[in-house]
Amino acid sequence: NYVTGDASHWDRFSNWAETMPKLIGNPLYHWNQLELARYFNVFDLLGPSSAEKIYSHCNELLGKEGLSSRKLIKQSNVKVICTADDPCDTLDHHEKINKDSSIECKVIPAWRPDRAMMPEKGKDFISWVESLSEASGVKINGFDDFINALEKRHQFFHEKGCRLSDHGIETFYAENYKEKEIHSIFQKAISGTYLDEKEILKFKSHMLYIFGVMDAEKNWVQQFHYGALRNNSKRLFEKLGPDIGCDSIGDWSVAEPMSKLFSRLDNEGKLAKTIIYPINPRDNELVGAMIGNFQDGSVAGKMQFGSGWWFNDQMDGMIRQIETLSQLGLLSRFVGMLTDSRSFLSFTRHEYFRRI
């Protein structure tokens, strides 16, 4: 009721305030207090006794023009924001923002083509292919058309300033296949024909490779966020849908397919600059060691072990990532922290990282 329901703003806030003292040891406690301190000048600890006073103070500030979203971005010294965008997105808002001279921060898209790799989704995949056809202006009758449409959108994103891709995958895919098989699998997918697990994995393997080639040819950076086990509660998924807090850490075997994919791209001279974010901390040493195999001297730190992500985005997780990278690679070549939160107050997470 207090998250997705129709509870009032005050009821939501007061219940959160009641929860805060119970969060000692959880990063939410630090994040919340940092946000209150940096943006609202509140240094009291949020709890049941302070909730009403803090609520009134924050609402008063939010009602003033000085604490707008733009002000928060400027105050946080943000120079560039990358959004995660589906290949079918129009990017109209990016164009409007970048034409507005009053906005000092640059906002650029990032390519997030996850839905292009999900033939197992049946009707949803078919619907997405239709949307891709409309967005690209390419009539998609077969796999070659599908790739042509994606390449057109990739070029469109490039023209809009995109230099970064992001792939949310369960694991790395590197099955053996023949390209004619992929054409057949695609035809089955868009006709609504059942695909077995091997066909699905072969399709994902080829698409991950194709996207790697596209990124390398445009000198983009490719990112891989992998390992999440999603929608674990069937009950809540059927009631509320995806992305409602029922995702957790998976334990796929990843070393061999990761190596195989990178080796194929590297051997063809098509391995782009890469950042890898494992969700399972057991993979820290795996990733830290793996990236050393594919550094090629073209750019310092071409292969990156990304900062602690999701369940590792907290003090111990950050320390583990930093220590592993220091021991197995070069911390001096690390590209640093990122904030993948959807909140305009989340820039305090960079302070949290810097303190560590």
Task: Label each PLM-derived region with a short phrase.
Residues Y173-Q187, H206, F224-L286:
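Catalytic core of soluble alpha/beta enzymes
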Residues N1-K218, K270-A272, I276-G288, G292-I356:
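Metal-cofactor-binding active-site regions of metalloenzymes
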